[in-house]
Regions:
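Anionic-ligand anchoring segments at beta-strand to alpha-helix junctions in alpha/beta enzyme folds, i.e.
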Residues: 82-130
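Short hydrophobic beta-strand segments
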Residues: 82-88, 135-138, 167
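Peripheral docking tails and interdomain loops at the edges
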Residues: 181-256
Length: 256
């Protein structure tokens, strides 16, 4: 176990969570470990139910991504995009940054990647777009937030500067577009985590991070392979490592 876990497990003011061994991925970039830590933190902070029902829904959605998006992922990789922009609002902004990081890590920096919020991207960051750029928008399940997401999505498609603009959503009732991928549960929006015949409570944006990130991780892995790299260890120079080296942990509140 890591030093921080060992310290926290014996501290009265800390709450340490030990994840199962299956979450301890062995590759360079964190994939299952990221998902495991995110879900564990969400449950620990009571942002996701601890009874396992919601987690099971999210697991099914993740499996749906891997089963149904292979053709789309393969098509994106064949396009050989040199830049990728991920967009997300609220919690999905953090996911956009994580998705961009995965692309950077697994392609050893050969694919320039940016993670931004839709409103922020409208300003200076938008200049990164060119014909070799893929834009992936993680659409919010919040009705108000989604209106801003869709406005920018329409603007980017209207501008026709980026090579391709796609959107991921968990909602069926959105403006139809060939580049909108619907990650629906059991073939329909919402799925069912309640009584028979009762519509499931919509997933929160925090919960959506988990199936959305599977798409981003798979895209980064396949793009890495297309560049002739080894996804488990793409950085041949050894300048970055799976576990950061040479970091000192200093006593908190010590001399300034």
């Amino acid at each position: 176990h890591g030093e921080l876990y060992r310290r926290a497990s014996s501290a009265r003011s800390a709450y340490a969570v030990l994840l199962p061994e299956a979450c301890n991925d062995q590759s360079f970039a964190m994939t299952s470990s990221f998902s495991g830590m995110l879900l564990a933190a969400a449950v620990a902070l009571r942002l996701v139910s601890a009874d396992g029902t919601r987690a099971a829904r999210l697991a099914r959605l993740g499996a749906h991504v891997l089963a149904s998006c292979v053709a789309e992922l393969t098509s994106l990789v064949r396009a050989q995009f040199e830049r990728v922009v991920y967009l997300g609002s609220s919690e999905l902004k953090g996911l956009a940054r994580e998705a961009a990081l995965k692309m950077l890590e697994l392609t050893d920096g050969k694919v320039v990647s940016v993670g931004e919020a839709p409103l922020g991207f409208r300003h200076g960051p938008k200049t990164v777009l060119d014909g070799s750029t893929l834009v992936v928008a993680f659409l919010s399940n919040d009705a108000y937030t989604r209106r801003y997401d869709l406005d920018l999505l329409a603007e980017l498609r209207r501008d026709a500067v980026a090579g391709r603009v796609i959107a991921l959503t968990n909602r069926m009732h959105l403006p139809e577009h060939s580049d909108t991928l619907v990650l629906a549960e059991d073939g329909a929006a919402g799925g069912a985590d309640g009584a028979a015949g009762t519509p499931a409570e919509p997933l929160t944006d925090l919960e959506l991070c988990l199936p959305y990130v599977v798409f981003a991780q798979a895209l980064a892995m396949l793009r890495s392979l297309s560049l002739g790299l080894t996804p488990d260890s793409p950085n041949a120079a050894g300048t970055v490592n799976r576990v950061v080296q040479g970091v000192s942990i200093y006593p908190y509140g010590g001399a300034r």
